[in-house]
Every structure is written in C-alpha cells, then in structure tokens.
Amino acid sequence: MATVTSSAAVAIPSFAGLKASSTTRAATVKVAVATPRMSIKASLKDVGVVVAATAAAGILAGNAMAAEVLLGSSDGGLAFVPSDLSIASGEKITFKNNAGFPHNVVFDEDEVPAGVDVTKISMPEEDLLNAPGEEYSVTLTEKGTYKFYCAPHAGAGMVGKVTVN
C-alpha cells in the first residue's frame, strides 16, 4: 500500500516592522470660488414671483374647470346628481349618463335668464344619451338661474337647477 504525504510551507507576511511614511510635501492647490450671479435677495424675489405665478395659474385653472352632473343616481334613481348647483359664468357643465337609461338635458325656456336662447344650450328633445358614460356639455355665460329637465323623465321628477354667478 502506498502512502502519499504532502507538505507545503506557507509564508504569512508580517506587517509589524513597517512604518508609515511621513514624507510631507508642500502642495499648492487653486480653488475656484463661484461668485453668485445674483444676490440672495434677488433670488428670493424670483422665488416669490414663481410662487405667485403658480398660484395665479391654479386659480385660473380652477375657474376653467367643468362641473359634472350625473344623469341618474348611483342607486338607479331618476335624478340629476347634483340637482342644484352654482357655477361661475363661462364654466362648462358636463352632463354624464350614469345609469344607462335614456336621458337628455333640456333647459326650460320660461326658466332661464332673459335673452338666453334655450335651443343653443339644450339637447334636442328627441336626442338621448343612451349608454353609461355618454356626455353632453354646455357652457353658460349669462348670469342667473337656469332650470333644466330630462324630457323622458321630467314627470318622474328628474329636474334640476343651475345658478350662474
């Protein structure tokens, strides 16, 4: 029987005798100092202008937003939701079929501000929004109170009112 033996010598380096180099050299470093192009006061003024412009844009966008009126309540009722609303002059109202019953939006010619032509703001009585999600939009500019109804369901109480300020 043969026996194999192996012996290896491993050398482990020792750092005990090493000393840190303490060589010092004089070095010259140029540092560029950035000079502000505007003063802090001018910078804060610019920030103020940006904040004011952003706020003004938000206010104007808020005035241009559309009001939404659902045609049919979530429980299937024949109603405009909301049935009474106030908007700013020039604000768009979007009437959206919520329930899938055929609905329309007709403004009552006797219940709008004087001089308003209801044929220009109403849907024709024979036109209907049949499917959920179908929409009709109108923008009212004349200040006053406008009453509207759904022609197929007015007898069931599907009426509404919008006040334009």
Curated annotation (Swiss-Prot):
InterPro entries: BlueCu_1 (IPR000923), BlueCu_1_BS (IPR028871), Copper_blue_Plastocyanin (IPR001235), Cupredoxin (IPR008972), Plastocyanin (IPR002387). The keyword Nucleus does not apply. Disulfide bonds: none annotated. It is a peripheral membrane protein. Residues 1-66 form a transit peptide. The keyword Metal-binding applies. Its cofactor is Cu(2+). It is found in: Plastid, Chloroplast thylakoid membrane. GO terms for molecular function: copper ion binding; electron transporter, transferring electrons from cytochrome b6/f complex of photosystem II activity. GO terms for cellular component: chloroplast thylakoid lumen; chloroplast thylakoid membrane. SUPFAM superfamilies: Cupredoxins. Keywords: Chloroplast, Copper, Electron transport, Membrane, Metal-binding, Plastid, Thylakoid, Transit peptide, Transport. Pfam families: Copper-bind. Transmembrane segments: none annotated. Residues 67-165 form the Plastocyanin-like domain. CDD domains: Plastocyanin (cd04219). Belongs to the plastocyanin family. Participates in electron transfer between P700 and the cytochrome b6-f complex in photosystem I. This is Plastocyanin, chloroplastic. It comes from Silene latifolia subsp. alba. The gene is PETE.
